[in-house]
Amino acid sequence: MITLIKTLGTAALLTAGVAGAARAADIDDRVTHGYADSNGVKIHYATMGSGPLVVMIHGFPDYWYTWRRQMEGLADRFQVVAIDQRGYNLSDKPAGVENYDVRLLVGDVMAVIKHLGQQKAIIVGHDWGGVVAWQLAINVPQVVDRLIILNLPHPRGLSRELAHNPEQQQNSAYARRFQQEGAEKSLTAEGLAGWVKDPDAKKKYVEAFGRSDFGAMLNFYKRNYPREPYTEDTSPVKKVQCPVLMFHGLGDTALLSPALNGTWDWIDKDLTLTTVPGAGHFVQADAADLVTKTMRAWLLR
């Protein structure tokens, strides 16, 4: 079964975002911080609430704090855990491109789940966190209870669009730049935080990026992002075996919405796809209230 939802306009999104920012201003005082060991790599996480485990995985450029509004909205019914991926903020930053292989990133999430005494979790991922989340669901299905993806198409969809869609090829030029040697030298903490709209949050982001390793951030692209010449993945499909909720801000210029087409063919359970006009790549921030309320309703159904 597939449910398609198209909702909200720009004005409503802006109102929701301002309200969410005010409520989340002091979340630092209400989370507990911890570390899990992932084969010698220390993975930092922030957690709040109790109940079924929800693990949230950020993308680029970001850190655990991106989930603050969703954490607040779920913590009365769930234990919500937001991690810093390796290379970011308070997590370890191992040297070497090979240490950012997606299989190791998957292992980091599994280490957090095990560290918290659980065998499975609801997995939430945005951008590169979405890459990790998809790979968990596809290759380690026994640890994924349900899957929530934000602005990251299924890998089959992205593979197809990179191979055949000139607009997606053009809009992925940033990734090709990131794959070049020394690309991190052009990055600054202030520049990476440029997408953050709330001034107080932006200060936190600049501090977090100051603790991060820019080269490590780009190793995600160097190790895992497809390289030219792009080819479509036509290998046998391993279907996702759990229910899936997807959000896609339609203003995303990095990951275009045509990559969503066909997603239902790669999922064996129900898929709920929520497209959000007026929101961009960081839909969890641009449409914070919508994302949180939809996520909560879907999880509690």
Features from the language model and the residues they span:
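Bacterial N-terminal signal peptides
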Residues: 9-17
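Sec/Tat signal peptide C-region and signal peptidase I cleavage site
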Residues: 20-24
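Flexible "cap/lid" subdomain of the alpha/beta-hydrolase fold that forms the substrate-access gate
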Residues: 25-31, 41-43, 53, 81, ...
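Conserved HGGG/HGGXW glycine-rich cap/lid loop of the alpha/beta-hydrolase fold
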Residues: 41, 47-92
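Catalytic histidine-centered segment of alpha/beta-hydrolase-like enzymes
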Residues: 279-288, 292
